[in-house]
Amino acid sequence: MANHKSCEKRARQTVVKTERNRFYKTRIKNVTKSVLSAVELADKEKAVEAMKAANQYFHHCVSKGILKKGTASRKVSRLQLKVNAI
């Protein structure tokens, strides 16, 4: 239990930020899975559409500070390679 006012505030902020980060991280996993499932089905049109949405979301997460720029670029690049292989 926090003893100082500032510690209590930091504890509250941590709860809010943890919840927000969990939302973004879950959505990242979901958009990644949607691309991979389209690739698995060899559905080029669906994969390209899902990849476009994933690319936008990864870069949105970078602007929010959820992911680092290099991490997002690496993930997008690896997904794009799989989409291009169809």
From Swiss-Prot:
One of its GO terms (molecular function) is small ribosomal subunit rRNA binding. One of its GO terms (biological process) is translation. The keyword Transmembrane does not apply. Coiled coil: none annotated. Keywords: Ribonucleoprotein, Ribosomal protein, RNA-binding, rRNA-binding. GO terms for cellular component: cytosol; small ribosomal subunit. SUPFAM superfamilies: Ribosomal protein S20. Pfam families: Ribosomal_S20p. NCBIfam families: S20. Belongs to the bacterial ribosomal protein bS20 family. Binds directly to 16S ribosomal RNA. This is Small ribosomal subunit protein bS20. The gene is rpsT.
